[in-house]
Amino acid sequence: MKAGDVINGYTILEDFRVVGAGLSKWTFAAKDGREYFIKEFLSPTYPDEHAPGSAQTKMRKRRRCAAFERHHRRIQEALASVSGVGGNLIVTLDFFRWGAKYYKVTEKVEAADLGPADVTALAFQDQLVLLKTVAHSLRILHDRGIVHGDLKPSNVLIKRTELGYTTKLIDFDNAYLAGEPPPPEEIVGTMNYYSPELVGYIQETGTAAHELTQKADIFALGLIYAEFLTGTPPAFDAASQYAGVAARA
């Protein structure tokens, strides 16, 4: 897909760009006079009758696709009541398959180019607004029984307003219902912000699935707060590599 192509009624405005660990691509698209952010998932891909592979292989891939669809639609439905444009949660507005690929559409956000070091330089009152707005967004999720699952500074967009700044919480691809995380081998994200219980679950060292609740996000939020206020993550034993690992030591 390239600029000018149309996907499910969305006109692609720029060529897609690969992001993160190469698991997806994104660009901007227009529909009915409004611009959107659109993400193309590189995996899974849906095999049609002409796809290579045995019938058994294609059936296995289709089962995986069905599970992928169920997961995304479940989170989308859980957040349906807060899915309007303009809020501080940038949730899925549209999710669909086009050919073999899956796509997700969200509101387009004009974010300020501010990282944790830039936030540290802001007046404390501005910092406080940022801390409060991201916490409020997280509470909306948590009140609906949803764990974000990949909370980190790059998923907290900072937007300039007439009065200063606010935050927009994005990227719910790794979200799950509290106590119902995906299998350990399917969890992806940034380990720097993993909670101790999430580390234990992934390493299969005694943490059960039901123990992964909203608390995992609160651990990550604390790390983000530290970066926003000091410019650097909290100090811990370097041998542990990650804060969540250090907290389990």
Residue ranges and their predicted role:
Residues 142-159:
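Catalytic-loop of the protein kinase fold
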